[in-house]
């Protein structure tokens, strides 16, 4: 109960390794791209850089699907979205019919090998587009600085890793991690001042 059932792809009446087929792409993106935008209006300027990948697939597995695995029992955590959508003995029959993920199992325990096969159940689209860098600045007009010893001054605010557009919502898709156990790129904000004397 609560285990994954696989399709007999070759139709020989037995589900085994001969039913395995290629799925999706590799976890190394076939396409990596980036583009920038720059705009200036009067004393204001804006710079943005976007980066993304496409034709990339990764699979949910590891401690995301086996949080009780040997050696990890005291240090693993389970993603709340996965936990909320797994088959559980405490669920009602209706809840279990709607469960997206199989029951959680301990490594080496009943169902652990079956439920952790690479399949379309755990395959995820790894493509994303990210606003990697964004900066907005204001250059103080020279007419204001005329009577000072400052030749020019620009004030700016910038940020890194501000927005990510992706179908995958469990953790940062840029990590390429199968269990979310890698730190994502940090979101950083900076306020600065450039001055020439």
Positions of PLM-derived features:
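Outer-envelope beta-barrel architecture signal
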Residues: 31, 42-44, 127, 149-153, ...
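Transmembrane beta-strands of outer-membrane beta-barrel pores
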Residues: 41-43, 52-56, 133, 140, ...
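Repeated loop/turn-to-beta-strand initiation elements of outer-membrane beta-barrel proteins
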Residues: 43-47, 143-144
């Amino acid at each position: 109960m609560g285990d994954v059932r696989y399709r007999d792809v070759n139709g020989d009446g037995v589900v085994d390794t001969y039913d395995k087929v290629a799925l999706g792409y590799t976890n190394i993106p076939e396409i990596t791209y980036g583009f920038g935008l720059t705009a200036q209006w009067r004393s204001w300027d804006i710079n943005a850089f976007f980066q993304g990948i496409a034709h990339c697939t990764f699979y949910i597995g590891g401690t995301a699907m086996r949080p009780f695995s040997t050696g990890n029992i005291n240090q693993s955590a389970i993603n709340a979205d996965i936990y909320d959508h797994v088959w559980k003995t405490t669920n009602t029959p209706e809840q279990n019919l709607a469960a997206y993920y199989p029951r959680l199992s301990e490594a080496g325990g009943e169902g652990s090998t079956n439920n952790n096969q690479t399949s379309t159940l755990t395959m995820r689209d790894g493509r994303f587009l990210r606003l990697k860098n964004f900066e907005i600045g204001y250059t103080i007009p020279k007419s204001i600085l005329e009577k000072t010893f400052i030749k020019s001054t620009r004030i700016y605010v910038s940020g890194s890793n501000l927005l990510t557009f992706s179908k995958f919502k469990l953790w940062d898709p840029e990590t390429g991690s199968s269990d979310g156990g890698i730190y994502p790129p940090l979101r950083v904000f900076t306020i600065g001042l450039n001055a020439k004397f």
